[in-house]
């Protein structure tokens, strides 16, 4: 059960659309600008480096947090699996409609 719960939490962590939240804080909807990609690179192009760095940091912290959660819950192997689950959440986010 610990493995499944860790993977679910890691997936949900990866699903948080950090770039969209950062851009929304600055009054920009990334899905309606440039190529429509709600990612950190589009945030950089639309907001500039000073305002977009939290998007890059948030994406990095999602993966790091998932890995540390997995290691704490079940060792290195589960850490790798948790990072994979976070990557799946990042690529196929549950919270895409935010």
Give the ranges of each region predicted by the language model.
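Cytosolic, membrane-interface loops and tails of multi-pass inner-membrane proteins
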Residues: 20-52
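Alpha-helical transmembrane segments
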Residues: 2-24, 50-98
